[in-house]
Amino acid sequence: MRKLSFLDRVVEEIDSYARFTKHPLNPNRKSPSANTVDGQLSDNDKKHAAGLMRVDYTGEICAQGLYRGQASVAKSAQTKEHLYHAADEEYDHLAWCAERLEELGAKPSLLNPFWYWASFGIGATAGSISDSLSYGFVVETEKQVMKHLDSHLKNLPVNDNRSREILKQMYLDESEHAVEAQKAGGKKLPKPVKAIMKLQSKVMTTLAYRF
């Protein structure tokens, strides 16, 4: 099997990015909201729900970038496979959020290309150091995503049942990813690194909610 050159890998990643940002997306799993009906939602309810779901969509874009960046330089085939599998599950989340945004009459954040490639760079940097550090980033990323999801579940409009079902399943999946990464040997990240990740996350959520 021919070994991919650096240029081949760049083209492959650009193609992958184009694939999972081209709508409509085709998830491997049916949306958790498929059999759920919303209650009455006002225009303000829809606007607020759309802002939260846009943040969650962008969070999944970041996770895709991080995982694919890590996988591109992973030391072992097992780690590479693990990360690509996690990215595939995150693809379902992207599709669910994209569908819900469309239902709410909204679009994904305009800044998603920046967040994806920034996350890809962070992932590739961490992955080039060691697989254990790479897994450590997965654990911390999933923990932060779970905090966002928990907050959004509490702040969604009361009658937004469809968004709620999506976020509940996403929370379960993210929790599983964190546990798997920890079992795979995830290294605890230094406090300064965690602080930077939290700051980046705060900036992302603030901007993505608005546009």
From Swiss-Prot:
Q: Where is the composition biased (Polar residues)?
A: 28-42
Keyword Methyltransferase present in the record's keywords: the answer is no
The Gene Ontology biological process annotation of the record reads:
ubiquinone biosynthetic process
One of the Pfam families matching this protein, by short name: COQ7
How the protein sits in the membrane?
Answer: Peripheral membrane protein
* CDD domains for this protein: DMQH
* Job of this protein: Catalyzes the hydroxylation of 2-nonaprenyl-3-methyl-6-methoxy-1,4-benzoquinol during ubiquinone biosynthesis.
Family, per the entry? Belongs to the COQ7 family.
Q: What is this protein called?
A: 3-demethoxyubiquinol 3-hydroxylase
The organism of origin for this protein = Francisella philomiragia subsp. philomiragia (strain ATCC 25017 / CCUG 19701 / FSC 153 / O#319-036)
